């Protein structure tokens, strides 16, 4: 007995069993023999009793007679223990040494490995062991040990290798159907029948499982073997080894083959007894029913085993009865990574299971005639028997027959029994309402089970949903109603948290979309109901989680991409029309659009359209938020007009600095202005001051973040907000005048003022109001005229036309003449030579100097006349503006003529960055035009991907083409027309980057000087 009072069965446990010295010596001898044998080839038919050149590995058996009473394990069992299990223990030991050095004493290598076997048997260590099996390197080494070990065992102990009674090919004695059923009789070495084996091949398209990395794999074919439980025909022992098949039903390569082996050893009466089961790890099942087939993930691939959940449980119980032990190293996970077949559970090991508990479970099974909840199937079988009973009045109202109610109330049977009873009722009753009532009652019973945890409820609800889809007695349209009833029951359940409901909704979507029993139309109807329930969740976080999980399931489903697109569009519209805040809609839609962009579920056109819709929603939300903020500022009783103006200006500046598009900025500033203009909280004169402040803020905002073009657009929107507001006409005139005053006080550009005039003329107000607003337009015109006069004056000063300077030049020249004349007279008077008289020399000098004065005066006058003439260099503001525009167009055209990206980059540097002869404003305008052109080309390419340009390339070389000329026959060339995208996106990005860098460089030139120019120059600002 063990210390805990349970029977010690370690001698039957291949991992923990202690061996005698004689057994150890025998094992060492066998191990030496293993590696001296050759490994046999594997044939192609996929089914064998032993590995040989004439048959394939699938089922292998060894049978021989052993003396009664010899309870020592036979060589096959011992070989598997040593070749596979001991080596796998060493691999696990190495993992723990590296990851958990504190376990060194517990896992130390010993002759009998007692400590480590005890460590593996301790349930407290299962979490650590599970991590080991999840480690990629460790898992790979465990798989390799299993593959190599089986090769050694199957080749060493084969009939072909001279081992008497060893593994050998199955000889088919009866083949009912080559594709469905095969059978053979297994005999011992004396020719006595031990059992009959049947193999059934199952074709399917409904089984989809997920690998550890989340990749989904469809199982198209698997097989089942009727492994015998009791053998009472002949004496001997037997080993059945079944190779795991690939997901398509074919056998794997011999270097990847693993096996499910049942070991039958001779019992006390000489008859074979099922003592051990060796299986790959981790073992999983596709579904929760007894007919669910086993599968494994090995080497990154999915393989099926020829055993079902029901058969596996039955065999494990027999092992326990015979004091044997499962040697599966299978570690289990809570559920499969797919919800297509429903949650898939696996048996949580223990490696050692106390016999007392096993025997108790078996007695219970015998008395109740239903599978009990034992350590083998506890995690597989929901506790249906504990579901809350329906009240009598519920039974009467639903019209559900007593057998079904008994199944849902007492539930002494399994979930499958409940489903069977439901199906029986559905077959007899085709009324949709009654079918829906039945499903509702069953769902309530499952959800109201207070002793069942959420996982069990979830599994049972999903089983119920799967049953609805697979039931042929419910027509397709009726399935929609029945499933929707089930969903409503889940929605109305008060005992389940919203976050948990979302898990059931997610599973329901997976089952719905992957069902082959309903059309896309019905799938969409059910999905709309699921989304509606998800959107009805009150908590924002839970709602987002629910909708996100639903859409993730849609993306992972096996429906076509065009169908996924239809579903996403429907869900988008559903969310958009739902009655909750724009903030909530924004979060949901933004999350969905990120998913569609990442997975490319939507076409580019549809993605763009949805993004625009989201932008509109965002705009509306921002507008409402902006109105609220403006009203809060205006409502503040302790703030005077100056403080309110300052606060509105700060708010305006924040909008202008925001990263949104210019269209959004215009709309928001218009909302601010219109809210101020229509506010009943502020007097008209105060509104005028506030709007005047808005105008100043726009005009003086940094040209870097807000170019002139953008200021013009925004000012037009501001004017529209005022002109089309609900104010009295006189108030609108006053506010418009204030806006214009603010622009001129801030020395705004004429283009900004013209934007206001244009908006007034083109507004949607009636003609009488337009005429009444002429006064405001006149004010604007006068302001513009004053501005033009100021600009002309600045231009004259810039051309050095200054009256005082001209006067000084003539006066100074005259003074020079007088001084020269004085010098001449003095010279003449001092001349003693007497050769020339004063009367002769003085007139000549005076005449010459006066002539110089006349020429100088005439030159100055002519220059002034030339400057003031129509052909002169003095130009008006509009003339200079036109000249600048022509220069901009000329250089833009020159840029477009550059054929390569490199030439265009050089053009940007030489003509825009380094060319200081061009004004700063002209260069910046050129860059703006080029940036817009590049963006337009890129947008057109994205919108019409099929549009191509033709490029002619020349190829040469050996070909059957004719030579170019008779003189050069060895040169062969051909023109090849190559279609290419109109815009190379990578080159487009390079050019736009170069333009942006150039703009930054130009804007940083003489920053202080540029500020002065903005105040004094009339050239169009940016």
From Swiss-Prot:
GO annotation, cellular component aspect: cytoplasm
Domain of life: Bacteria
Basic and acidic residues compositional bias, start-end: 14-24
Keyword Cytoplasm attached: yes
Any single biological process term in GO: symbiont-mediated perturbation of host cytoskeleton
Keywords from the UniProt entry: Cytoplasm
NCBIfam families given in the database record: Sca4_fam
Name listed for the protein in its UniProt record: Antigenic heat-stable 120 kDa protein
Organism: Rickettsia prowazekii (strain Madrid E)
């Amino acid at each position: 007995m063990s210390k805990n009072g349970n029977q010690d069965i370690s001698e039957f446990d291949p991992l923990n069993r202690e061996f005698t010295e004689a057994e150890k010596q025998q094992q060492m001898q066998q191990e030496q023999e293993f590696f001296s044998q050759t490994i046999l080839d594997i044939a192609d038919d996929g089914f064998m009793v032993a590995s040989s050149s004439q048959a394939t590995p699938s089922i292998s058996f060894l049978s021989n007679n052993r003396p009664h009473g010899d309870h020592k394990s036979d060589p096959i069992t011992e070989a598997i223990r040593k070749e596979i299990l001991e080596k796998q223990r060493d691999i696990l030991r190495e993992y723990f040494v590296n990851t958990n050095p504190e376990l060194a004493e517990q896992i130390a290598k010993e002759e009998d490995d007692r400590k480590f076997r005890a460590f593996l048997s301790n349930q407290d260590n299962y979490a650590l062991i599970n991590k080991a099996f999840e480690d990629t390197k460790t898992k790979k080494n465990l798989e390799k040990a299993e593959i190599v070990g089986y090769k050694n065992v199957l080749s060493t102990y084969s009939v072909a290798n001279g081992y008497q009674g060893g593994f050998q090919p199955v000889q088919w004695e009866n083949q009912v159907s080559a594709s469905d059923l095969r059978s053979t009789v297994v005999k011992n070495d004396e020719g006595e029948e031990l059992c009959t084996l049947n193999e059934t091949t199952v074709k399917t398209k409904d089984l989809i499982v997920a690998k550890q990395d989340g990749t989904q794999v469809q199982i198209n074919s698997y097989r089942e073997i009727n492994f015998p439980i009791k053998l009472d025909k002949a004496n001997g022992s037997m080993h059945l080894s079944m190779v795991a098949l690939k997901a398509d039903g074919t056998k794997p390569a011999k270097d990847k083959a693993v096996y499910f082996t049942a070991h039958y050893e001779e019992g006390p009466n000489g008859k074979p007894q099922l003592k051990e089961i060796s299986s790959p790890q981790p073992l999983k099942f596709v579904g929760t029913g007894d007919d669910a087939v086993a599968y494994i993930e090995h080497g990154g691939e999915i393989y099926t085993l020829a055993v079902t959940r029901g058969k596996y449980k039955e065999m494990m119980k027999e092992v326990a009865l015979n004091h044997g032990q499962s040697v599966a190293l299978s570690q289990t996970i809570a559920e499969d990574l797919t919800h297509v077949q429903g949650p898939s559970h696996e048996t949580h090991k223990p490696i050692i299971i106390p016999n007392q508990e096993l025997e108790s479970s078996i007695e219970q099974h015998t008395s109740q005639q239903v599978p009990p909840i034992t350590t083998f199937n506890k995690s597989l079988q929901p506790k249906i028997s504990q579901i809350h009973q329906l009240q009598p009045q519920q039974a009467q109202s639903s019209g559900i027959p007593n057998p079904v109610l008994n199944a849902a109330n007492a539930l002494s049977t399994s979930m499958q029994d409940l489903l069977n009873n439901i199906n029986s009722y559905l077959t007899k009753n085709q009324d949709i309402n009654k079918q829906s009532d039945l499903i509702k009652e069953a769902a309530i019973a499952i959800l109201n089970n207070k002793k069942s945890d959420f996982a069990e409820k979830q599994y049972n609800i999903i089983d119920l949903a799967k049953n609805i889809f697979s039931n042929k007695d419910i027509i397709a349209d009726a399935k929609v109603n029945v499933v929707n009833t089930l969903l409503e029951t889940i929605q109305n359940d008060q005992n389940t948290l919203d976050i948990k409901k979302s898990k059931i909704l997610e599973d329901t979507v997976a089952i719905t979309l992957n069902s082959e029993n309903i059309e896309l139309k019905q799938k969409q109807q059910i999905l709309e109901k699921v989304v509606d329930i998800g959107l009805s969740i009150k908590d924002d976080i839970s709602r987002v989680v629910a909708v996100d999980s639903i859409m993730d399931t849609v993306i992972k489903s096996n429906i076509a991409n065009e169908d996924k697109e239809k579903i996403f569009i429907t869900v988008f519209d559903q969310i958009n029309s739902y009655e909750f805040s724009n903030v909530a809609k924004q979060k949901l839609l933004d999350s969905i659009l990120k998913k569609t962009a990442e997975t490319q579920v939507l076409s580019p056109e549809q993605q763009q359209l949805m993004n625009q819709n989201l932008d509109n929603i965002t705009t509306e939300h921002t507008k409402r938020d902006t109105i609220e903020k403006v009203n809060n500022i205006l409502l503040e009783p302790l703030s005077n007009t100056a403080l309110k103006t300052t606060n509105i200006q700060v708010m305006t500046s924040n909008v202008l600095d925001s990263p949104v598009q210019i269209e959004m900025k215009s709309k928001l500033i218009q909302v601010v202005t219109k809210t101020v203009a229509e506010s009943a909280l502020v007097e008209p004169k105060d509104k005028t001051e506030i709007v005047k402040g808005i105008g100043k803020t726009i005009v003086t905002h940094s040209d870097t973040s807000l170019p002139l073009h953008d200021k013009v657009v925004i000012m037009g929107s501001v004017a529209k907000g005022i002109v089309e507001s609900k104010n009295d006409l006189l108030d609108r005139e006053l506010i418009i005048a204030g806006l214009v005053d603010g622009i001129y006080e801030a020395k705004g550009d004429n283009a900004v003022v013209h934007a206001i005039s244009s908006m007034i003329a083109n507004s949607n107000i009636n003609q009488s109001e337009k005429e009444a607003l002429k006064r405001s337009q006149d004010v604007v015109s006068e302001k513009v005229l004053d501005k033009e006069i100021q600009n002309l004056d600045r231009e004259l000063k810039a051309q050095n036309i200054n009256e005082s300077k001209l006067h000084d030049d003539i006066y100074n020249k005259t003074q020079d003449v007088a001084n020269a004349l004085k010098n001449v007279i003095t010279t003449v008077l001092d001349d003693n030579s007497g050769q020339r008289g004063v009367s002769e020399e003085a007139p000549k000098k005076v005449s010459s100097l006066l002539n110089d004065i006349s020429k100088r005066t005439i030159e100055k006058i002519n220059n002034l006349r030339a400057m003031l003439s129509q052909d002169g260099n003095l130009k008006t503001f509009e003339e200079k503006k036109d000249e600048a525009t022509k220069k901009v167009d000329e250089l833009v055209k020159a840029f477009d003529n550059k054929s390569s990206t490199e030439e265009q980059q050089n053009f940007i540097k030489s003509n825009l960055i380094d060319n200081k002869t061009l004004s700063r404003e002209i260069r910046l305008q050129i860059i703006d035009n080029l940036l817009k052109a590049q963006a337009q080309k890129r947008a057109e390419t994205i919108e019409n991907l099929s549009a191509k340009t033709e490029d002619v390339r020349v190829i040469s070389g050996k070909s059957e083409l004719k030579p170019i000329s008779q003189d050069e026959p060895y040169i062969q060339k051909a023109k090849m027309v190559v279609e290419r995208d109109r815009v190379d996106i990578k080159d487009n990005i390079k050019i736009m980057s170069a333009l942006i860098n150039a703009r930054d460089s130009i804007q940083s030139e003489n920053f202080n000087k540029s500020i002065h120019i903005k105040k004094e120059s009339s050239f169009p600002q940016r």
